[in-house]
Amino acid sequence: MIDRKKSSNIQNILNKPYKYGFSTEIQSEEFPKGINEEIIRLMSHKKQEPDFILKFRLKAYQIWKKMQAPDWGHLHHNEINFNDVLCYASPKLEQGKNKAQTISEEILATFEKLGVPIKPNNKQPKIAVDAVFDSISFGTTLQKELKEQGIIFCSISEAIKAYPNLIKKYLGSIVPAGDNYFAALNSAVFTDGSFCYIPKNIRCPVDLSTYFRINNKEAGQFERTLIIADENSFVNYLEGCTAPQFDTNQLHAAVVELICFKNATINYSTVQNWYAGNNKGEGGVYNFVTKRGLCQGENSKISWTQLETGSAITWKYPSCLLKGKRSTGEFFSVTLTNNAQEADTGTKMLHFGRQSKSLVISKGISGGVSKNTYRGLVKISGSAIYSDNRSQCDSLLIGKGSESNTYPNLHVHNSLSKVEHEAFVSRIGEEQIFYFQQRGINIEEALNMIVSGFCQDVCNKLPMEFALEANKLLNIKLEGSIG
């Protein structure tokens, strides 16, 4: 007979204290709350930006004021009061010293506790890291080594001053300010983020990584990332993020733009672990992100891989514009929701080039009373003959109160292309757990094994450093007390 007491704990097995929920006590420089033209001008002046960036911001702000927040997602959350949002908050810099000179021991200790290597360490894998704390970057590692090969990797704020021509040419070219409500907001008030340029015929010798940490309780984080891979180049980019544990909501609205030229490859991997709120649905980060890549040249390739385990609300659709002949777009995703979390995420694969290909593999895991939605668009234009798409969207339900939805949208405008879509939903039930228990495997181990197998197709696509972290993170999320 099945142990009802133990099996009833399946729904709660995801509940594990959030290990990154600590906050760092530091002195902070803050702008007044709210989003308005005065704040935008103050921010641009503070960052000593050229006029074209201020114009870009102000234009975006005017667009944003006329827009309405999207309500088509399968999401339910309190209305965001932008008058209560801090657009800019940064640790106070000591007078006469730059950011690198004034990284306090507290901030260094924070990143070390998070496992982010911003100090040289021969024991750790060699990864170039840009560490962003609230509204500013505290420097990028391995810059000198990368510059020797012509690779630019720095904060977006530094790039605006040092490489204005590249910024002017590419900023907003893939995600224009008016693309959507949150992209317009980001374009108006973006603070920091990363910039990367890989020159022709260069394979980046190390993985590039940016780590985002929200520390201030009232601050929003509005980072901007821009990556350009010139002809015959290759780069792996890794992104991670965490936030303290508060009983109020924080806002994260980011934009990522990728440009990939002939025979170039960009692999963009994310482990998203913002605070998700407590088991009553209190607190957590509102995560509204726009990510898009352009495969401009022949044989160009962009691959998005993501593990989404955090945030109270997630609204995110990494996408590919496949313009080049024989270009390739890929999307590999695991989204794990628990308690009252809600995620509406997916991808767009837009085919314009002949013989272009796209692959979508999405895995959704839902526990508690969470809602997990996949929303996808595949569009093959009339000019994209002999193109091919395959999509696989699978869902795994844990317990009886969770919800899973899949909304595929397929448009094929020529008769010489092929689209495949398949999906299935399954539930971890008492019988499966009982089967494992009969072989001496406890509930937590059983759940870990089931979920690990379910996610294997995606986790195998992550770089080794992230794959290890991803498996560890899934196991942490799946741990809980067994009655």
Curated annotation (Swiss-Prot):
Keywords: Chloroplast, Plastid. Belongs to the iron-sulfur cluster assembly SufBD family. GO terms for biological process: iron-sulfur cluster assembly. This is Iron-sulfur cluster assembly SufBD family protein ycf24. Its main location: plastid. GO terms for cellular component: chloroplast. It holds the Pfam family SUFBD_core. Disulfide bonds: none annotated. It comes from Cyanidium caldarium (Red alga). InterPro entries: Fe-S_cluster_assembly_SufBD (IPR055346), SUF_FeS_clus_asmbl_SufB (IPR010231), SUF_FeS_clus_asmbl_SufBD_core (IPR000825), SUF_FeS_clus_asmbl_SufBD_sf (IPR037284), SufBD_N (IPR045595). It is found in: Plastid, Chloroplast.
